[in-house]
């Protein structure tokens, strides 16, 4: 059966229609999911490992002998991973490491005025938990994207959770990243275990990694419950927006369109172009390429959320993209570098004909953990800074204190903070004794 995607003329749409066109599919607006997750969190908090064994038996249909993967199994994992995959993992690891090592924050250390010194020091988050989803295929690349930045900044305790049975590829990727505390537990129960800690799984300070609606809901609830724990971001369905000019390659655009939609039934792909002919050619190519794909059933379901929009000008394409704030933005146009100036909101950008999203998903070195659901308006993709915290430091010498004291006293009196005022006056008195 041929796929039909209607071509939308942006100029002809009302403001209401435009909002509806760029609307994301609603995935987890479900009170039942919220209640199920709440119960799981409570049970794991109260019953610890027992709850994890029970949930693994119920949800994964596996009776575990041990929650923790043995060191020997991790070390021996390379015996079960073929040489080609090992080589590919090594290429990806090296590129990710190179890019993320360059993200180290500039140290601020300045004398604001004579005698007043300010600086920032950067410290790693001590304990982090990495969640790697299970499902139909091992997400080896996600292990690399999370583990490498954590190791670069020096997080002291790094643990990894993934639903059983954990594949040898995931164990191997963890091993070469130096991760040896691996636990075969998944879903909302894994998030709860890392948040509260159990006899086997240590409590962490921050949880990273994508997952299904139950994992996402668990991260949301846990983040609201605990002050000493945070999360990286709430991952929604994968999405792509492609801006293409008259000379763009329809075959390549169709392949990018389809590659995004195979992630899941709620994935969304949008093409925005001033060329009606290109739009028609892309639809034609989608039908040709779809026939040969193994996940065409998933793609056919996600097609209902996909859009092809024809604009009057190329600049209008960028206006639409900034409204949508895509996770992945492809600019398949001439002089794509020069067009970067028009991009305000995007998770990750792929410039030119040869830059497939798949390259960033795996090996270019940039991180593929990106803001979705429009959160690229205010959020960034994962960097080493997500595994660190910045602490401000200040030091005043005697003259520095004297010079700023009147301003501090004046401002603290305006705010009626007389104890603040007193803390300065006591130091001024102590200065008299020093002299």
Curated annotation (Swiss-Prot):
Give the residues the record marks as binding Zn(2+).
260, 263, 361, 420
Q: Which GO terms describe its cellular component?
A: cytosol
Q: Which UniProt keywords apply?
A: Amino-acid biosynthesis, Histidine biosynthesis, Metal-binding, NAD, Oxidoreductase, Zinc
EC number(s) in its UniProt entry?
1.1.1.23
State the source organism's domain of life. Answer: Bacteria
A single Gene Ontology biological process assigned to it is: L-histidine biosynthetic process
Cofactor(s) required for function per UniProt: Zn(2+)
Q: Where does substrate bind?
A: 238, 260, 263, 328, 361, 415, 420
Q: Where is the active site?
A: 327 (proton acceptor), 328 (proton acceptor)
Identify the residues that bind NAD(+). Answer: 131, 189, 212
Q: How is the cofactor bound?
A: Binds 1 zinc ion per subunit.
> Per the record, what are the reactions this protein catalyses?
L-histidinol + 2 NAD(+) + H2O = L-histidine + 2 NADH + 3 H(+)
Which pathway does it operate in?
Amino-acid biosynthesis; L-histidine biosynthesis; L-histidine from 5-phospho-alpha-D-ribose 1-diphosphate: step 9/9
Family per similarity comment? Belongs to the histidinol dehydrogenase family.
Query: What is the annotated role of this protein in its UniProt record?
Result: Catalyzes the sequential NAD-dependent oxidations of L-histidinol to L-histidinaldehyde and then to L-histidine.
Entry-linked NCBIfam families: hisD
Quaternary arrangement and interactors, per the entry? Homodimer.
HAMAP family listed in its UniProt record: HisD (MF_01024)
Name of the protein described by the UniProt record: Histidinol dehydrogenase
**Species in which this protein is naturally found:** Buchnera aphidicola subsp. Baizongia pistaciae (strain Bp)
Q: What lineage is this protein's organism placed in?
A: Bacteria, Pseudomonadati, Pseudomonadota, Gammaproteobacteria, Enterobacterales
